[in-house]
Amino acid sequence: MMKATLIAIASLLLAQNAGAPGWESQPSGTNIRFRGVSAVSRMVAWASGERGTYARTTDGGRTWTVGQVPGAAELDFRDVDAFDADTAYLLSIGEGEKSRIYKTTDGGASWQLQFKSSRPAAFFDAMAFWDRDHGIAMSDPVEGRFLVITTSDGGRTWRETPREGMPPALEGEGGFAASGTCITVEGRRNAWFGTGGTSGARVFRSTDGGRTWAVAATPVAHGKSAGIFSVAFRDARRGVAVGGDYTKESESKNNAAVTRDGGRTWISVGDARPNGYRSCVAYVRGAGDAMLVAVGPTGSDYSTDAGASWRSFGAEGFHTASFTRAGGGAAGWAAGERGRIAKYTGAARN
């Protein structure tokens, strides 16, 4: 009887561990800092980082090809959005002309400069795409309002959205270009971006492809180095924002909030918060899309209840993470310091 009980307990623990989230480290072949990652499928993913660097895998991460965009050695690519093994966009940050968007359609063999900011005061933080043709990118405030550009032709042209459609920024308000995920999109026209700074941490939302915006305050911590660093939405109503203070990596107070009404109102996560400052949050794109993963320099956390509570898994630090649907399961990667790349292990949960 005792033996049978022990076997049953062991089997249960094995089953639980088999579905538990985790990261499997993969050699990237570089020691640069990665800030962007984009999961395409179980086999294909892209990453981006400093010194004009990008990386790509087409074999599930067993090998990574690392390259440098010609003429971009001084640029820091904080965001990458990829659609397949051939097609990807890179966004670099910085004031004025350092803010750029490049595109490849041949797996990185060549890159086309699609956008270079002509505004000296602009500082682009991140971009997102609804589909292959329609995308959006946001900059810190220029003349008192956040600057947004959109494309409807696969990046061949990028146009500023109407200034009058953007609410005024608060004093000291800005975005955080930490992971390429302070802006996100959903459906065909919905978009959100998170902010921080000395006056508050807010989420801006648009339902018309970025032409007009509304804004809501959140309970996320704010300050000179604090605010919302990442937003993710499961659908048009349910979303999560994470952040904190990047100078206080272990501080978890007021580092996450959830919305159930499309970003009109935000509720602080209770005591079971992510375990420290978090630079990225993403839905694990498996069956049901009910699981979330958040990453930061002190480790990773997961939620199986739409962000209401969190559990830690692993102390290895990452800056960014990305997941995609693949054959009904979940495929994902995380990336960070010194060329660190890891593939997600574990089953998606409802």
What are these regions (language model features)?
Residues Q16-N350:
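Residue-level hotspots at or immediately adjacent to binding/recognition sites across diverse folds
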Residues A4-L13:
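Sec-dependent N-terminal signal peptides
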